[in-house]
Amino acid sequence: MGWFFKDTNLVMLQTPHVFFSPDPFERNLDTFHRMPNEGELFYGIVQDGNDLWNASFFCGSCAIIRRKELMEVGGIAVETVTEDAHTALKLSRLGYNTAYLEVPQAAGLATESLSGHVGQRIRWARGMAQIARTDNPLLGKGLKFGQRLCYLNAMLHFFYGLPRLVFLTAPLAYLFFDAHVFQATALMITAYALPHLAHASVTNSRIQGRFRHSFWNEVYESVLAWYIMRPVLVAFINPKMGKFNVTAKGGVIEKAYFDWTIARPYVVLLLLNLVGFAVGIGKLFFFSGDEVITLIINMVWTTYNVLLLGASVAVANESRQIRSTPRVAAALPAFLRFENGRTLVCKTEDFSQHGLGLSVPPDSDIPTGSRVSVSLFRSDEEGVFPAVVTFSGTGRLGVQFDNLSLQQQAELASLTFSRADAWISTWGTAQRDKPLRSLGSVVLIGLRGIGQLATSAFKSSTPRPVSPVSKDSTP
């Protein structure tokens, strides 16, 4: 809040969006807290860059906005489905300042399923295309040149759908039809393209190391490209089309399954690239000279696309999620009181809305079903909550809260989910990027995705045994 007193022209302060549950990429690929997620690049680097040019924008939550100035622009913008960014653009046009503080202050749930994740990104893409069409930052008054470029960059980002699909299919034009995508010799293409690709990879790795690993941008874009291409193009032509949808969050996935519906575009593209690669192998026996080099270049390109599409397929393999409320890893001081007067000092391993995982001395003999009072602390504040022991193991204890009142639930949230230090400890702490290691992880996940696709296809095609009808059964 101090920045609002220091700068009376400041109308909006945005902080990062942090998620205490894994998104579909992190859960289905098992990369949670080991690899930066899709959104960390934006909140770790892009918004900081926007802030340099006074162009950081509102992202819907985790922000403070002055009410008086908000009313000057008619309140939250409703003309587009990305009302947050559009509202910030309107405020910037009036000459007000916006700011970004890269210190997590709150956290929330990520999307549970890939279909929900795709639906959310479709709305973002459609909304940004609507703003670009109806309130283009390059046009109109009030913005400085740097602000115009920053807002334009945010909007044009979601137009990657068509270029990404072209990238995933371009080498097939040569493999199937002998059509040259580039009118140049194979040697010239290699001489110009390889140094550029190597330089771009090293540069991005150095700049984005903590917030985006090499080659993962291609995976994210490959998953979303098919689904955002049409909404973006339609919204840019007719910005009034499309409606606002709220992203559903929270829930369980009782059984692991392969989402054939959402994966259909990736599967088709994957099969096309595999067939193209097979055609390329056949042509190796008939081509000669420079044609062989051109063929090999296109086959290498196709191999890369196969791995990207395999990774995209792997994301569609939804893993089981039986917890209705996610657990957040955190080491917080805790204190247990038993009914017989015994006390025990311990620490939390994780917490959720309904219970705690506790680290206790290995020799603690605590039977399952014991009723305890759990104390949690924040500075000089203490909260006491009734609980029941549901798990007791060597050095570990699981407790479930017992009929908390509304006031106790609010106090629990204050001592756990509302702690800013709980989110700072995991922000930007993923391993720094190493391009070769990152490429290796994409290759392995791509191969795993192809294997999962084959397994799921086999299971789907295998007829299920039919149980015989009993003679005594009635119609």
Tell where the protein language model's regions lie, with residue ranges.
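Catalytic donor-sugar/metal-binding loop of nucleotide-sugar-dependent glycosyltransferases
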Residues: 90-106
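Membrane-embedded multi-pass helical conduit in multi-pass membrane proteins
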Residues: 157-242, 258-319
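Juxtamembrane inter-helical linkers in multi-pass membrane proteins
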Residues: 239-252
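Long helical/loop segments within the catalytic core of UDP-sugar-dependent glycosyltransferases
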Residues: 2-81, 92-93, 114-153
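Active-site donor/metal-binding and catalytic loop motifs
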Residues: 102-116
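Acidic donor-binding loop at a coil-to-helix junction in glycosyltransferase catalytic cores
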Residues: 81-87
